[in-house]
């Protein structure tokens, strides 16, 4: 019965099959590169999602951001099952309440992936992990795949900016706005 399967389980089964067939190595890095590629096949193109976001935004900015946040989760860009592992608590201090977070959702590289990254051809594309070029990027051993990533273009004071949610969600609906130019 596949009706009640969670996305994590579906992807795990597909990844295990890919490993058993020798399509990918069995490491977090290679599994993440491959499942991101799979999820991209199920997503509409960026322009279609941007158009839908704008249509919703014209009616209700709140509904547009809800739509985009849910899409970021449903596309596995925000990996809910990893974010659940994060530790969060508050501490009273002389300066007020401090939020403490321990991010366990960002995958650690295994020794084989670290060695492979050292030997990998260096690339300056994308320029950084927070730029427009990441949208749809296939990734490599030393740069995460972003094929399932969709960025919403926005304008601030006449400038072009990108709006996205953080894949690691330090806080609820943690978003990032970055300049369209480096």
Q: Which residues are covered by each model-predicted region?
A:
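Active-site microenvironments that recognize anionic phosphate/pyrophosphate groups
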Residues: 1-182
């Amino acid at each position: 019965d596949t009706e009640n399967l969670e996305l994590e389980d579906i992807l795990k089964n597909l990844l295990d099959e890919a490993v058993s067939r020798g399509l990918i190595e069995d490491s977090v890095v290679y599994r993440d590169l491959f499942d991101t590629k799979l999820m991209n096949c199920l997503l509409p193109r960026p322009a279609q999602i941007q158009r839908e976001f704008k249509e919703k935004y014209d009616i209700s900015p709140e509904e547009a951001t809800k739509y985009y946040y849910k899409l970021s989760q449903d596309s596995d860009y925000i990996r809910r099952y990893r974010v659940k592992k994060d530790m969060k608590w508050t501490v009273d201090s002389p300066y007020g309440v401090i939020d403490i977070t321990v991010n366990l959702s960002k995958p650690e590289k295994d020794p084989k992936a670290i060695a492979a990254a050292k030997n990998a051809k260096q690339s300056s594309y994308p320029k950084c992990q927070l730029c427009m070029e990441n949208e749809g990027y296939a990734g490599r051993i030393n740069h995460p795949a972003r094929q399932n990533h969709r960025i919403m273009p926005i304008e601030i004071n006449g400038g072009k900016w990108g709006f996205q949610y953080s894949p690691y969600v330090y806080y609820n609906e943690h978003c990032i706005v970055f300049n369209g130019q480096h």
